[in-house]
Design a protein with these regions (language model features):
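Short, compositionally biased leader-like segments
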Residues: 1-7, 173-174, 179
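Active-site loop/lid in soluble adenylation, ligation, and acyl-transfer enzymes
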Residues: 2-157
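Short acidic loop-to-beta-strand element that houses the catalytic metal-binding Asp/Glu
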Residues: 31-32, 205-208
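A short mid-domain helix/strand-loop element embedded in enzyme catalytic domains
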Residues: 146-177
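A long amphipathic alpha-helix within ATP-dependent nucleotide-binding catalytic cores
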Residues: 174-205
């Protein structure tokens, strides 16, 4: 394991961006993506550190850590659902299939917690009792575990700090069929359960 001194000494070498001649980058918060003509995509995880979509600095080795973590989770969940990863030729790089993303963000929540406007606790504390189209009783406490995990959807708001909560009816109105939503719901819960099982082995608690 690297010492704090070794990490500090690597700050000047932190990986901010890359340029591949002949290809146009799609720059995200942390990853730079390049679409290839053959239907594949190059994803490069940088060391950019962001908070609510604002870059605040660079953290040495962050890119390779999150890229390798993603690769590990893809392997651990391949029996639940296919994924886009083809190869990891470098600690910071994933070669993947291009795919059309869902027009929504999906989050499985096991606890009533959070500090953002779209979090369960923020809305509950403000007096809301129907959140994401689901009814919640009075008397819940912050960070309390829910009787069972719930699947929630939110509108993707690119360039904005927070997402907007959606009900199932909102999801269907955005062109997602009831059949597809049922599959999304099922796969999301199974992924969350697998995540919980593996997190416990590392003395971690998967909250959402």
């Amino acid at each position: 394991m690297l010492t704090s001194a070794e990490i500090r000494s690597a700050i000047p070498l932190a990986f901010d961006e890359v340029s591949l001649p002949g290809l146009t980058a799609e720059r995200g918060q942390v990853r730079d993506n390049y679409a290839l003509a053959d239907g594949r995509r190059i994803g490069i995880a940088t060391d950019r550190f962001t908070i609510f979509e604002q870059q605040v600095g660079l953290v040495p080795y962050q890119g390779q850590i999150i890229n390798q973590l993603s690769a590990w989770w893809f392997e651990q969940t391949a029996d639940i659902t296919p994924n886009h990863a083809i190869d990891i030729p470098d600690p910071n790089v994933t070669i993947a299939l291009s795919a059309d993303p869902l027009p929504i963000a999906v989050i499985v929540r096991g606890f009533i917690c959070g500090i953002t406007p779209s979090s369960l606790w923020t809305q509950y504390e403000a007096g809301e009792r129907v959140i994401y189209g689901r009814s919640f009783p009075d008397g819940l406490r912050k960070n309390q575990e829910l009787p069972r995990p719930i699947v929630t959807a939110a509108e993707k708001t690119f360039g904005q700090a927070h997402e907007r909560p959606l009900t199932v009816e909102d999801v269907l109105a955005r062109g997602i069929s009831a059949e597809l939503w049922d599959r999304i719901h099922d796969v999301a819960l199974r992924l969350f359960q697998r995540g919980r099982q593996l997190s416990v082995l590392a003395d971690l608690l998967l909250v959402d």
